[in-house]
């Protein structure tokens, strides 16, 4: 568990945090440049010192301004991966990985190297590596110090699109197989969608929202970052069954289910899906014959006029689903809070 209750002056703003983060999964730190994202993780790592408050990791006090406690970075057991890999140029990859390696991680070296796909790189110098390869080595080096927490400061920011696509699957594997909580600084919605369990949104040094990805994603706080034509819903689902005759997989959403193209996932596997509001249409009665495989019973929570369109907030199995319809359709269907209807979903994408 990471307890953050501190403040630190940042130019004309003051970074003020009072949140408790669980000791698992990935928490994305999101916001525009200058919001305080990097300043937050620098304070946690010990690179900077808050003027007030406390930072406590798993019961260990890292910083207590009132008591004059401020552990040095090397005593905090916090790993840090920077935007630029910062590898030692005169050490081969193997030497970089072993630099600062904890004794408890010696037996984990081969496993971690395999997990990050860097075994072919062990005898190469950093100067011969691509940007994505360097970042994988940097992540491996940080993990081999046996940290209780891993901080990643926009690790994909300096990479071009092909290198980002190369590194993203390795980060996804880490989230599944390495039981170390991570704080992931980013201003990329795509990275957050694929990696984060939780999101903390910062603005001018203040926390505007903090919670599960699907909750924050559907809140008004995210509206400035979401293009209107890309309004969408993020939902947690589990694998229910694989169709015996067709290459389709059913995903449980409350007491209903969605069909998607067949997934190579075991039953009960937890997944996250994204549904674009523009891919959801509404009907008052379930259609008798339709090519659309996914028709869910839903209740209208509210509706909002938006530049000639209507955003309809629906509840499905205790979760929020958004639909975008025209004012004409809203009036013809008499859309109002509490109305039960059916949502036809034309497309579903798997995010994690």
Swiss-Prot record:
| PANTHER family registered for this protein in UniProt | ABC TRANSPORTER I FAMILY MEMBER 10
Organismal lineage:
Bacteria, Pseudomonadati, Pseudomonadota, Gammaproteobacteria, Enterobacterales
| The protein's assembly and partners | The complex is composed of two ATP-binding proteins (ModC), two transmembrane proteins (ModB) and a solute-binding protein (ModA).
Which gene specifies this protein's sequence?
modC
What is the official name of this protein in its record? Answer: Molybdenum import ATP-binding protein ModC
SMART domains per record: AAA
Report the catalytic activity.
molybdate(out) + ATP + H2O = molybdate(in) + ADP + phosphate + H(+)
Its Enzyme Commission number? 7.3.2.5
Listed binding positions for ATP are 31-38
């Amino acid at each position: 568990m990471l307890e953050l209750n501190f403040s630190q002056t940042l130019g004309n703003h003051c970074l003020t945090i009072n949140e408790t983060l669980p000791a698992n999964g990935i928490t994305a730190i999101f916001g525009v440049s200058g919001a305080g994202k990097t300043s937050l993780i620098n304070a946690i790592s010990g690179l900077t010192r808050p003027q007030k408050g406390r930072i406590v990791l798993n019961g260990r006090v890292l910083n207590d301004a009132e008591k004059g406690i401020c552990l040095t970075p090397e005593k905090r057991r916090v790993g840090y991966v920077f935007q630029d890999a910062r590898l030692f140029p005169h050490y081969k990859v193997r030497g970089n990985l072993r630099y600062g390696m904890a004794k408890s991680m010696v037996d984990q070296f081969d496993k971690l190297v395999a997990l990050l796909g860097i075994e072919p790189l062990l005898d190469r110098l950093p100067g011969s590596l691509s940007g994505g390869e360097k970042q994988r080595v940097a992540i491996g080096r940080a993990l081999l110090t046996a940290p209780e927490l891993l901080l990643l400061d926009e690790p994909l920011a300096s990479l071009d699109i092909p290198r980002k696509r190369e590194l993203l699957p390795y980060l996804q594997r880490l989230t599944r197989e390495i039981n170390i909580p991570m704080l992931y600084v980013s201003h990329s919605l795509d990275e957050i969608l694929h990696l984060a369990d939780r999101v903390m949104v910062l603005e001018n040094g203040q926390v505007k929202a903090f919670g599960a990805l699907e909750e924050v994603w559907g809140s008004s706080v995210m509206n400035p970052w979401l293009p209107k034509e890309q309004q969408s819903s993020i939902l947690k689902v589990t694998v229910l069954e694989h169709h015996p005759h067709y290459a389709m997989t059913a995903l449980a959403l409350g007491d209903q289910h969605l069909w998607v193209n067949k997934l190579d996932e075991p039953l009960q596997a937890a997944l996250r899906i994204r549904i674009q509001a523009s891919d959801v249409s509404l009907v008052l009665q379930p259609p008798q014959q339709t090519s659309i495989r996914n028709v869910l019973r839903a209740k209208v929570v509210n509706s909002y006029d938006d530049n000639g369109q209507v955003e309809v907030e629906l509840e499905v199995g205790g979760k929020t689903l958004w639909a975008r319809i025209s004012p004409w359709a809203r009036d013809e269907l008499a859309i109002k809070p509490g109305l039960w209807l059916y949502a036809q979903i034309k497309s579903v994408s798997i995010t994690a």
